[in-house]
């Protein structure tokens, strides 16, 4: 009888409540019911492209048991670890299928172990499933922060770092060494969510989420300890030794004996003690920390940030990779938007008994715009237009049917217009609409070898096309749709969780 994944999750939870040192995941790794669940979730395209499996039309679990037996005997040459070193053969095709199956099983086990582990260190850790979630928090919180630090988490990480993070989870020794072999033999590039995947697809995203969650908890707990440090620092009897500890943690060892630099760091550290709240925001591998500090103290906080990640996670950040941004002067390019602040003057008139007094109040507001020039350059790289904005025919799509060509252009426009629905200059998207509309017409003209006039007559000015099995006409890019889009107020879509790969490569 087949069992669902939720059944095993409940079993693991009950055993973990009874036994605190519960770590028997490797025993369930060799059960056949897990392989049945994994076989259902293997993509159909993978099986469809495999010619050798098409002939058999069925998959026998005897071959699966042979791989498990070879894994127990540690004959890794016959298993899926050394796929890249082999040539294409029947064993290679089966080894890829085994890899897909075993990968799904590891996904289930790591997901269950991650749910069982409860980390009560930070209760205010909140996740935003929507892409537009950070911009709502921008409008509410970032107005009060003058300085920010922006950086990118590296995708290329040493595999032993992931092994050390996995060691903290409740994993038994056998499963831990099995994961260690997988990480050291194949996983060199982590793929964050919504990123184009390289190498291991699903396991890489799981490892990246665990790795990013560990970074968040480590850095936020470090900031909480830093707030409690001033009281310990003032009550310390030997102030010179405590300043030496600070310099040893935040400065290089060569500068340790320089007493003048110790005094300078001590003064800077006393100034940085009085900072207010810190706003920490991370989306996939993009990290933004906004501070309520002066520029001089922000420079010191930048050194703290670099030094912390170097000692805790062995990252070698350069100073140009960790940017210091002042909201009053600079613009931030964050997730495909240009974010900057401006001041508006509000005149206030107060009526007194004998006269009227006029006051001018400066109100700080946030502006989130569409980078229209960067969008045109990006569309030119993908073959939709020139650098100047003149539309071209998409030759790679001219092989498709007419309905598929129009649908692809329509979906691209809907993703761009939906993604930038919360921007303040939505009217600039009319240029993108014009480029996509004429490039669609030119691809149809290139396919049928016709002039543009005949295509406008055939598909009408709105490029509407009648679809089979549907009533009415389906409009693609009409200016009436754009007028309704422009009349709408600025709105963020909290349902937006994924974007088109073309749009993602633009804002990443």
From Swiss-Prot:
One of its GO terms (cellular component) is chloroplast. Keywords: Chloroplast, mRNA processing, Plastid, RNA-binding, tRNA processing. GO terms for molecular function: RNA binding. Its main location: plastid. It is found in: Plastid, Chloroplast. HAMAP family: MatK. Usually encoded in the trnK tRNA gene intron. Probably assists in splicing its own and other chloroplast group II introns. This is Maturase K. The lineage of its organism: Eukaryota, Viridiplantae, Streptophyta, Coleochaetophyceae, Coleochaetales.
């Amino acid at each position: 009888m087949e069992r669902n994944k939720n059944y095993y999750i409940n079993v693991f939870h009950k055993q973990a409540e009874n036994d605190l040192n519960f770590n028997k995941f490797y025993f369930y790794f060799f059960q056949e019911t897990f392989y049945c669940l994994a076989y259902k979730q293997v993509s159909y395209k993978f099986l469809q492209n495999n010619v050798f499996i098409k002939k058999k039309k069925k998959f026998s679990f005897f071959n699966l048991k042979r791989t498990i037996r070879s894994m127990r005997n540690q004959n890794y040459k016959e298993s899926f670890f050394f796929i890249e070193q082999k040539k294409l053969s029947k064993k290679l095709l089966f080894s890829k299928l085994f890899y897909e199956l075993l990968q799904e099983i590891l996904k289930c086990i790591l997901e269950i172990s991650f749910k069982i582990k409860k980390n009560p260190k930070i209760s205010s850790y909140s996740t935003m499933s929507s892409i537009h979630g950070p911009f709502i928090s921008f409008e509410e919180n970032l107005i009060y922060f003058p300085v920010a630090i922006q950086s990118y988490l590296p995708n290329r990480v040493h595999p032993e770092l992931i092994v050390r993070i996995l060691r903290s989870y409740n994993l038994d020794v056998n499963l831990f060494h099995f994961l260690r072999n997988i990480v050291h033999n194949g996983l060199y590039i982590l793929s964050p969510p919504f990123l184009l995947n390289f190498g291991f697809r699903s396991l890489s995203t799981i490892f990246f989420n665990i790795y990013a969650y560990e970074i968040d908890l480590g850095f936020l707990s470090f900031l909480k300890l830093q707030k409690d440090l001033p009281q310990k620092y003032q009550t310390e009897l030997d102030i010179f030794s405590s300043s030496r500890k600070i310099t040893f943690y935040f400065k290089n060892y060569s500068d340790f004996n320089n007493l003048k630099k110790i005094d300078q760091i001590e003064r800077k550290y006393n100034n940085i003690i009085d900072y207010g709240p810190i706003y920490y925001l991370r989306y996939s591998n993009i990290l933004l920390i906004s501070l309520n500090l002066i520029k001089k103290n922000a420079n010191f906080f930048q050194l703290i940030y670099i030094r912390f990640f170097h000692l805790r996670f062995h990252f070698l950040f350069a100073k140009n990779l960790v940017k210091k941004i002042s909201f009053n002067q600079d613009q931030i390019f964050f997730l495909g938007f240009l974010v900057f602040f401006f001041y508006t003057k509000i005149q206030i008139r107060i009526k007194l008994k004998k006269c009227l007094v006029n006051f001018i109040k400066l109100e700080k507001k946030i502006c989130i715009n569409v980078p229209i020039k960067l969008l045109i350059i990006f569309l030119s790289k993908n073959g939709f237009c020139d650098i100047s904005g003149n539309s071209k025919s998409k030759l790679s799509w001219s092989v498709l049917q007419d309905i598929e060509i129009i649908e692809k252009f329509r979906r691209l426009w809907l993703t761009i217009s939906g993604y930038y629905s919360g921007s303040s200059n939505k009217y600039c998207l009319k240029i993108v609409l014009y480029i996509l509309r004429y490039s669609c017409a030119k691809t149809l003209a290139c396919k049928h070898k016709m002039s543009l006039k005949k295509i406008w007559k055939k598909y009408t000015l709105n490029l509407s096309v009648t679809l089979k099995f549907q009533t009415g006409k389906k409009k693609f890019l009409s200016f009436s749709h754009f007028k309704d889009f422009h009349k709408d107020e600025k709105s963020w879509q909290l349902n937006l969780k994924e974007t088109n790969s073309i749009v993602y490569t633009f804002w990443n």
